[in-house]
């Protein structure tokens, strides 16, 4: 039988977290190496996912690391890696659709073994600073959600745009085709009796122009009046657009996005009008707002999971150098019908 130490432990086995006083410093690879009786190099390879480490050894090291409360320094690992599997994602998290793209891109990239560094632009953080941040963490390619998230400084970085029109020929583009979903929306409104339909426009840019063009084309195809009203991409914009007044006789609204539609509905309710009865309302993006019981908004779904997966696939191909030819991918949109259209 093996000798026992005075404390009841077997000789030659390093104490683990439950046997020793809690460490007061950040747990390091050296701590794990001493506790497991292995070299620092082996520990580093195991925790870094190297295939050179046998499964039983990896499991032992991971168990020791967990017992010691080890937390990897992710930033240091990313900076030290010879060829890190990292993508950047630049978006505006004030927009519901961008939030959805972010979630889908993170999930899909993780399945492919890549990390995604996310930066959001807003009034206090411009697009160049956002790009600089993801590139400092060695993103090998960047996905931009909307052309407003494209940097004009970092033009040598492989770039994939989720949007309507690429500002440069070397940028990969994944777009949601507006025509099918918008055509379905106008067809539904016409079946429900609408004859004068107003489009609450979005902020200036390729996305707003593409949605407006699809709206006008669909109205023309169905022989109904297509009117436009200044709107925007947030709740206040939709609310103020309705308060400012819509053209006489308008019996249905198609809004640039769901947030704009949300504001329009609040204004209609404030005026004593019932959405789905007194005014039919359609949004775009099929966000969580649209699907909520509180709003139940008919909306055009942009297939964000499919769009994000295509963008991630192309970004990975560019990051690995597998494909240096800019691609153009398109995904159809589809109408999701709810109570706001009767």
Region spans (language model):
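Short beta-strand elements in bilobed, periplasmic/extracellular small-molecule ligand-binding domains
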Residues: 109-121, 198-199, 216-236
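Periplasmic-binding protein-like
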Residues: 88, 134, 138-146, 198-201, ...
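Alpha-helical recognition/docking segments in bacterial nutrient-uptake
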Residues: 1-3, 24, 85-187
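Short beta-strand segments enriched in small/hydrophobic residues
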Residues: 35, 40-44, 79-94, 188, ...
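An alpha-beta-alpha
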Residues: 185-228, 327-341
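Hydrophobic alpha-helical segments within soluble ligand-binding/sensing domains
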Residues: 172-199, 209, 235-243, 261, ...
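Flexible loop/turn connectors
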Residues: 5-6, 22, 247-254, 259-342
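N-terminal helix-turn-helix DNA-binding module of bacterial transcription factors
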Residues: 1-82
